[in-house]
């Protein structure tokens, strides 16, 4: 795709499955989607579905906790398109459903890294790309607020 596109750009983090994939497919009807996720195979399957429906996507297989990679992606988006119209943030780490006292240190660390730290780092990276007209949509764990025991 050329650097000039008639379609607005939508960045979808966590695009490989679930809500992220569903949002990427829905947005691809009216946007050029930049799909970010760790799982390359799932991103390629998403791209196949988007293309089959007549849409276009740019795949960015990376982990949002990799600050350097996300900074480079944002620079590349700026250099190629100048801005994004929409950011859908659906990348979350949902630890196994368990009482908090039983949560492993590894799951805790991964949850904080993905759900808090990476999100906090991405906001100032993406705010200039969104400008005053862009919109951001954040999704959280679908089990938030439920009692697990």
Where do the model's predicted regions map?
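Conserved glycine-rich Rossmann-like NAD(P)H-binding loop of the short-chain dehydrogenase/reductase
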Residues: 30-45
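Substrate-binding pocket helix/loop in short-chain dehydrogenase/reductase
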Residues: 98-100, 107-109
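Conserved NAD(P)H cofactor-binding loop of Rossmann-fold oxidoreductase domains
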Residues: 90-97
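Conserved glycine-rich cofactor-binding loop
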Residues: 14-17
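Catalytic loop of short-chain dehydrogenase/reductase
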Residues: 134-149
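The beta1-alpha1 cofactor-binding region of Rossmann-like NAD(H)/NADP(H)-dependent oxidoreductases
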Residues: 62-72, 105
